[in-house]
């Protein structure tokens, strides 16, 4: 993305404040963390040994002087296109190892302890180049396992205007397994999700092969019929990617891709629950139909997140505006993309639907962990990674005070002031 020259200084300043740029994280020995359990607000003591939760004990009260912070598993974001001035798949942004570090450290500050860098429809050579960088960084010690794999949103999506969103028509293609395998190898076999349009030629065979390799298939940016959607789910598609987005502005009232994806109980959905991507009514209806057990809250966030409000030029050459309240839009007022971190979606779905904090955390942590087979995280249980967040709910906003990744305190709001 083409962004203002001061962004580089802004990002550097972030990490001087956060203090991680050159720090090596290593968690050895035993430690204890106190907080109010997110499920029932009861005081707890969590014991950690070498980054793993070894004990969870309810307490009558928190120790004297301990702040009353809610404790929950770290958030897991399955669709991060970029963050804090870093883009994972933009033709006018060079992705570097330091860029991946910077984005990860910034996400930690927002309570995200695990995320899938997302590569959208683009030049295959750019995708390969960026996957090489990401695959190399995936296992870097200082990132503490925060990147378990990647999400490919395309290029196997609908070429029809509206359904393809901002994706370049030039690079959209039908699913071809041999070409995907080449990309898969560049990722060091770490692609965890592919989002595709099931109506494309060869899609069902492709879904079968993804399932055989443990790659989650999402349905998105498509205009498939109810029959095709049902067939795709039968073949192994598991989630509707950012439901309600990737639709044409004008769709038939009764015959469109939305209803069959909502009505199929076999299909999970992900929702972008910022205040701009979906209406409150959409969020309420989607939640009431699918429930907390079949929903993933995602951010679909872009590299504009955390940048100063102002006017920017998108990779497509459009003038866009990041407003004071965090809306990322075209100058005509239409939403361009998301610039809100996942924690904002957690707070917003609670505000809009009346769901509990426990339900919101399930959708933003537990469910994505289960979806991708990340059995070591997503809940607070003995034997799991100590990926934890401590926070306050202030006027329906989620204020992160501390973030632990594998038992390491990687963000502390007090020490960052």
Segments and roles (model prediction):
Residues 259-269, 287-299, 305-391:
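His/Asp/Glu-enriched, well-ordered alpha-helical/loop segment
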Residues 158-188:
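Conserved phosphate-binding/catalytic loop of the ribokinase/pfkB sugar-kinase fold
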Residues 177, 181, 185-309:
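Active-site core of metal-dependent hydrolases
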Residues 380-417:
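C-terminal cap of metal-dependent C-N hydrolases
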Residues 81-84, 89, 101-133, 145-158, ...:
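Divalent metal-dependent hydrolysis catalytic cores, especially in the metallo-beta-lactamase
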Residues 2, 6, 11, 25-61, ...:
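N-terminal metal-binding scaffold of metallo-dependent hydrolase/deaminase domains
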Residues 13-24:
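Bacterial N-terminal signal peptides
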């Amino acid at each position: 993305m083409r962004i203002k020259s001061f962004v580089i200084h802004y990002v550097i300043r972030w990490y001087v404040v956060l203090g991680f740029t050159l720090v090596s994280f290593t968690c050895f020995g035993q430690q204890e963390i106190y907080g109010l359990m997110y499920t029932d607000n009861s005081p707890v003591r969590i014991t950690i040994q070498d980054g793993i939760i070894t004990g969870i004990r309810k307490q009558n009260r928190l120790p004297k002087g301990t702040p009353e912070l809610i404790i929950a598993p770290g958030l897991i974001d399955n669709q991060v296109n970029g963050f804090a001035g870093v883009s994972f798949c933009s033709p006018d942004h060079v992705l570097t190892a330091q860029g991946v570090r910077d984005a990860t450290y910034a996400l930690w500050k927002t309570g995200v302890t695990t995320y899938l860098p997302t590569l959208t429809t683009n030049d295959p050579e750019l995708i390969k180049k960026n996957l090489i960088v990401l695959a190399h960084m995936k296992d870097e010690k200082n990132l503490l396992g925060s990147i378990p794999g990647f999400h490919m949103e395309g290029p196997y999506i609908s070429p029809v205007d509206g359904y393809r969103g901002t994706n370049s028509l030039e690079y959209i293609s039908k699913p071809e397994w041999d070409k995907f395998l080449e990309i898969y190898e560049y990722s060091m076999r770490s692609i965890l999700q592919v989002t595709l349009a099931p109506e494309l030629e060869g899609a069902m065979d492709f879904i079968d092969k993804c399932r055989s390799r443990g790659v989650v298939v999402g349905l998105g940016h498509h205009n498939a019929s109810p029959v095709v959607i049902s067939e795709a789910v039968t073949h192994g598609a598991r989630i509707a990617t950012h439901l309600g987005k990737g639709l044409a502005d004008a769709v038939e009232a009764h015959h469109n891709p939305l209803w069959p994806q909502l009505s199929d109980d076999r299909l999970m959905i992900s929702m972008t629950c910022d205040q701009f991507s979906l209406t409150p009514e959409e969020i309420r209806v989607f939640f009431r139909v699918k429930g907390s057990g079949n929903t993933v809250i995602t951010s679909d966030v872009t590299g504009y997140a955390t940048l100063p409000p102002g006017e920017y030029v998108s990779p497509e050459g459009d003038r866009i505006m990041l407003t004071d309240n965090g809306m990322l839009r075209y100058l005509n007022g239409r939403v361009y993309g998301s610039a809100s971190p996942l924690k904002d979606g957690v707070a917003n779905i609670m505000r809009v639907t009346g769901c509990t904090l426990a339900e919101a955390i399930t959708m933003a942590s537990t469910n994505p962990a289960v979806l991708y087979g990340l059995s070591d995280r997503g809940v607070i249980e003995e034997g799991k990674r100590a990926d934890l967040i401590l926070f306050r709910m202030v006027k329906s906003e989620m204020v992160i005070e501390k973030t632990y990744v594998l038992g390491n305190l990687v963000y502390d709001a007090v020490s960052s002031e």
